[in-house]
A protein has these predicted regions:
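Acidic, low-complexity, intrinsically disordered interaction modules
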Residues: 27-77
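Metal-dependent nuclease catalytic cores that hydrolyze phosphodiester bonds in DNA/RNA
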Residues: 79-236, 339-341
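Intrinsically disordered, low-complexity segments enriched in glycine and mixed charged residues
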Residues: 20-22
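Metal-dependent nuclease catalytic regions and adjoining charged, substrate-binding loops involved
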Residues: 30-36, 47, 81-94, 261, ...
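A short beta-strand micro-motif
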Residues: 2-10, 32
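Mg2+/Mn2+-dependent nuclease catalytic core
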Residues: 18, 218-219, 224-313
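Glycine-centered tight beta-turn/hairpin loop motif at sheet-sheet or coil-to-beta transitions
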Residues: 8-10, 37, 234, 245
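Short, charged/polar micro-motifs that form catalytic or ligand-binding hotspots
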Residues: 16, 137-145, 261-266
């Protein structure tokens, strides 16, 4: 997606391309950010064509064209009215309304967790259609996931940290004091021992104090929702870091040296493929940030076309499994077995 940020000295929005070449230049979408930091995303072909029709070639010579701010807002509102999204259960949402609701984690992981697909859903389907079916009704929350969630909150959404997390002044989760807190809250998702919390904050401090992290995330938005229809199915996503010209996902790891291997093991390539489609970006504009929980070292990983293509293949395989067991119901889950030969 092309990103244009309006400068204070600009009277209008200026694009660094001739009008005649605009459609090709903007084919992956355009995001326009005004001085008040309000952004206007034009992704659908109809919206981009509407922009093109109202753009003026610059008078100062070739190489640029411009459009008035009120025109941008008018086009945005009119084209967005037509965008609706239908979930797997048939519920239809206005896309803007849906994106706004996705900031609410209870909606994102609740209703959308059941009635929209995601990179996690595709990974589960590839591993086992039974695992996907179970994930719709039963939540699995390992200590690794809990720690990762805590680090994400503290690093990307620190305002939520104080309101969500409970720290019990014990070293172990098997203590009576910890169990009493879980009983009081009714769920352990945001309850941490002092030991767990302090270890996570060490990792967060190392990340936030890293000069490269500070530079790359300056002016970026965090935890930005995205939604689109891919191959006829609704897909949800959240960009951990939405920069001016890139998207990044933050991962935690216990061993940074093995991150490249783990990226394949945990199918991060599927996430890459889905995010590129949902947010309309090129794979070259996507990166993974990996923070080592033990050392505090930060790894930054770009991706290749091979990694993107691998994600596409897994994505298509996951959809095949989904259609077979949950749409066309060509086979019952109870008949699913894994066969092999030991030699």
């Amino acid at each position: 997606m092309r990103i244009i940020r309006k400068k204070e000295t600009w009277r209008h929005i200026t694009f660094p391309i001739d009008k005649i070449e605009f459609l090709n230049w903007a084919k992956k979408g355009v995001q326009i950010i005004l001085e008040d930091n309000n952004s206007y995303d034009f992704v659908e072909k109809e919206a981009i064509k509407a922009l093109h029709l109202n753009i003026n070639q610059s008078y100062n010579g070739p190489g640029s064209c411009y459009i008035e701010v009120p025109v941008i807002k008018s086009i945005f509102i009119k084209t967005k009215r037509k965008e609706t999204i239908q979930l797997l259960n048939g519920t239809t949402y206005d896309k803007i309304e849906l994106l706004n609701k996705m900031y609410d984690d209870s909606f994102y992981y609740g209703e959308l967790g059941k009635y929209a697909l995601s990179s996690s859903a595709i990974k589960n389907l590839i591993d086992s259609p039974k695992q996907y079916a179970r994930s719709l009704n039963y939540k699995t929350d390992t200590s690794v996931f809990k720690t990762g969630r805590l680090i994400h909150l503290a690093a990307l959404e620190p305002d939520k940290l104080e309101t969500l997390c409970h720290v019990v002044e014990v070293q172990s989760a098997v203590t009576k004091k910890y169990k009493d807190k879980v009983k009081e809250i009714g769920d352990a998702s945001f309850i941490f021992t002092r030991k767990e919390y302090d270890k996570a904050m060490y990792t967060v401090d190392a990340l936030l104090q890293n000069d490269v992290w500070q530079e790359m995330t300056r002016g970026a938005k965090f935890e930005q929702p995205g939604f689109d229809i891919i191959k006829g199915y609704p897909f949800r996503a959240k960009a951990d870091v939405l920069g001016t010209n890139y998207i990044a996902d933050l991962k935690t790891t216990s061993d940074l040296k093995n991150f490249e291997w783990n990226a394949k093991k945990y199918s991060y390539d599927v996430q890459l493929y889905i995010y590129c489609n949902v947010f309309k970006i090129d794979y070259q504009d996507f990166s993974f940030f990996a923070i080592d929980k033990a050392t505090g070292d930060l790894g930054i990983y770009d991706v290749t076309k091979n990694f993107f293509d691998s994600g596409k293949q897994k994505f298509e395989r996951g959809l095949e499994i989904y259609e077979k067991f949950f749409v066309k119901q060509e086979e019952e889950l109870n008949s699913y077995v894994i066969k092999g030969i030991l030699n």
